[in-house]
């Protein structure tokens, strides 16, 4: 048998603490996702072409460091476990890197700006990887109980949706307040605040969680063998495909969102109104995952259903705007976020279950390695989405802080509505084929506990 769960039930404080970990993640990565691209182009003064190239280049960097970090977490030995120590050490370092990334020097020559951008962004991505991979893997190490895992991921998603809502509501006003005389000062100050939140949340997560799934010591296993095992794990491959599509739709749209409100709607403050309208639906949507899972008993089918309706509601938004049809526009925004939040909970709840399936199928348990490729898949989707957006905007004549031409405005509009909408429907089709239901999962766990493998 590959693992043993000493205590299937997880204390409420541990579930809350785990949720706070994602609060921290979103106060860094969602800030980066939503604001970094427009910071680079409109504040730092870096060209769209350079930003697009960075997004693609950084994924080659991820392809190297994500599996390495995942493997290192699996090999970590400490009195705190395998994954928790990474939160304690890597979180404050990543917070500092976040601040450095948002330190703009618009007076520098273009080549100097690009070099600084590449170095700080790649270091930030590495730091975030050193926090996010062990954080994501930690859920599977806390319990093997499928219902408890669903509760933990619901806590994570609800906390994340609250954090995203708060961040989206307060960020533009904070940038205006602290950047009244200089936009670069505003971004730097906000980065300092969010960096502190990031570190504090992960300290709390470290302090109040516990790794209860015991993995016996095993001989060193090559990357080739681990990759071969992963390729035999069909539920995991579907989850990985879902994460790639998720990254493309989420981060591509997020990179566009401030451009959309600034240039298409003509008023960046609409973004704050939009954020206020989606925060409650976000929380409700995340909380709806568990009752729907109890009914369907298949996390993949739940994710598929949420993805389908996210796509349909997002496509509907193309026909309305905040300026002329505010009630319908914001209502559809709330509906879209409701379904998205349910999906977000479901897709992350799937991943720990795939670890047990892989262990049962191949005899190999490699939590961190598997989560590393989930993280990489999400980042690949992010890279393609953001690089494609930046490349198209640059190609068709985007000029920072100026009135944009019709083609550029059309790209911004479609990137906010139709393009992600279509890919959400594709995501729904992919995850519909996820077959690992609750009954089969529990049978697999029992076989592992009894030392049997089919």
Regions found by a protein language model. Give the residues of each.
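Membrane-embedded alpha-helical bundles of multi-pass transporters/translocases
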Residues: 2-454
